[in-house]
């Protein structure tokens, strides 16, 4: 009876050794200036504007393209591009800046100065509602039933801080600029590239090859093993689609290169998807004649926003918009590793440039508390109801 017991012990010990291994959480790549998304686990970087990060779902996903439709004078879209580049310098990311109008070195000299002290933490509390003070004589200016209602939160801010804050009234320290690893592409100084059978104009083809060479040479290609610490490449493309890039979509409706920018975006997104890089591109949409071309450009971008400046328009003198400098429209939100995207809680957005900071807020119009509202006075009613009403006074019912 002893032998079977030993055999059973041996067989039971063999049966206990299985190939089962406990599944552990995969290790995420840690890169300074990045964090994983809580929605889809995608690696995110900050755009340099915390309120813009909140609008587009927490930040820019690595491997994606952000399209910014320029305002009429390219003032605020250029500022967003500078915030995007400045955030890369503070986080230690590598930069690639391409331009055809202004030299990239000139744009780099205009980057805003970062705020690295404790004052930046106070920016998160701006725009928060304050409790109503019963002793304040201004608390009963509107109906009493609305007095205890919570005020509209105009400021857009996340519960956790991501990114840095910048002082728009100062430029970045030259020592920070010199320490940054920066690559430039100035179209007017580049040697023309033979297109051959390619449908791309020479400037677009040269720009695409320059980005591809940089990604492969500096080790940002995700398909190749990294020989050193991983980093993110930030690509800034200024005013693509303009005439200076050899494109004619801004000149006529039926342009000869109507598919040039679309083809360029196809190839660019292919490079971004397989590399640790993120791009921001500005396009003068108000100059592009064909709406179909602009629609293709938006659909070929992962994230798309548009800026409408009040400068030179009737809205600049409209008292309803006196606290803002323009409107922001969300054209497209990325859908990455999921079926649906995070929809913003509001589509009525406006931006303003304070003395030191560019912010995006909910467009909220407070109640009209002025005493000179457009209502008919009692004197007008009395005169209008009289049988001998004269002048511009009409009978009101």
Curated annotation (Swiss-Prot):
Please spell out the taxonomic lineage of the organism that makes this protein.
Eukaryota, Metazoa, Chordata, Craniata, Vertebrata
> May I have one GO cellular component term?
elongator holoenzyme complex
Q: Per its database record, what is this protein's job?
A: Component of the elongator complex which is required for multiple tRNA modifications, including mcm5U (5-methoxycarbonylmethyl uridine), mcm5s2U (5-methoxycarbonylmethyl-2-thiouridine), and ncm5U (5-carbamoylmethyl uridine). The elongator complex catalyzes the formation of carboxymethyluridine in the wobble base at position 34 in tRNAs.
| Gene behind the chain | elp4
Main localization of the protein?
cytoplasm
The record's section on Pfam families has: PAXNEB (PF05625)
The record's similarity note reads: Belongs to the ELP4 family.
What is a biological process (GO) this protein takes part in?
A: tRNA wobble uridine modification
Keywords per UniProt: Cytoplasm, Nucleus, tRNA processing
Question: Is Cytoplasm given among the entry's keywords?
Answer: yes
* Example GO molecular function: phosphorylase kinase regulator activity
What is the protein's species of origin?
Danio rerio (Zebrafish)
Instruction: Quote the pathway field.
Output: tRNA modification; 5-methoxycarbonylmethyl-2-thiouridine-tRNA biosynthesis
Q: How does it assemble?
A: Component of the elongator complex.
Taxonomically, the superkingdom here is Eukaryota
Subcellular localization(s) per the UniProt record: Cytoplasm; Nucleus
Designated name of the protein: Elongator complex protein 4
């Amino acid at each position: 009876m002893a032998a079977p017991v030993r055999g059973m012990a041996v067989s039971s010990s063999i049966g206990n050794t299985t190939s089962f291994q406990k599944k552990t959480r995969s290790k995420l790549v840690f890169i300074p200036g990045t964090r994983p998304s809580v929605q889809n686990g995608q690696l995110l970087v900050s755009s340099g504007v915390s309120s813009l990060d909140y609008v587009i779902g927490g930040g820019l996903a690595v491997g994606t393209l952000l399209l910014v439709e320029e305002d009429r004078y390219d003032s605020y879209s250029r500022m967003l591009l500078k915030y995007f580049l400045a955030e890369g310098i503070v986080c230690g990311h590598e930069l690639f800046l391409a331009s055809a109008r202004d030299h990239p070195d000139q744009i780099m000299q205009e980057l805003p100065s970062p705020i690295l002290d404790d004052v930046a933490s106070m920016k998160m509390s701006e725009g928060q509602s304050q409790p109503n003070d019963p002793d304040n004589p201004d608390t009963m200016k509107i109906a009493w039933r609305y007095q205890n209602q919570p005020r509209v939160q105009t400021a857009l801010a996340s519960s956790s801080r991501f990114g840095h804050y910048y002082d728009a009234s100062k430029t970045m320290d030259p020592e920070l600029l010199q320490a940054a690893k920066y690559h430039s592409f100035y179209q007017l100084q580049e040697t023309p590239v033979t297109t051959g059978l390619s449908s791309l104009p020479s400037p677009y083809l040269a720009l695409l090859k320059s980005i591809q060479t940089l990604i492969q040479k500096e080790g940002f290609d995700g398909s190749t093993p990294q020989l050193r610490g991983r980093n993110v490449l930030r690509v800034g493309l200024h005013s693509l689609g303009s005439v200076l890039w050899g494109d004619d979509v801004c000149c006529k409706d039926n342009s000869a290169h109507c598919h040039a920018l679309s083809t360029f975006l196809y190839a660019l997104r292919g490079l971004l998807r397989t590399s640790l890089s993120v791009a921001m591109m500005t396009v003068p949409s108000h100059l592009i004649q064909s709406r179909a071309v602009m629609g293709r450009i938006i659909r070929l971008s992962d994230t798309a926003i548009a800026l409408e400046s009040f400068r030179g328009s009737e809205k600049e003198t409209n008292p309803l918009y006196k606290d803002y400098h323009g409107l922001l429209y969300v054209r497209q939100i990325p859908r990455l590793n999921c079926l649906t995207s995070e929809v913003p809680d509001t589509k009525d957005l406006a931006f303003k440039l304070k003395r030191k900071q560019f912010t995006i807020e909910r467009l909220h119009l407070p109640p009209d508390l002025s005493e000179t509202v457009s209502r008919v006075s009692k004197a007008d009613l009395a005169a209008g109801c009289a049988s001998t009403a004269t002048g511009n006074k009409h009978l009101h019912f």
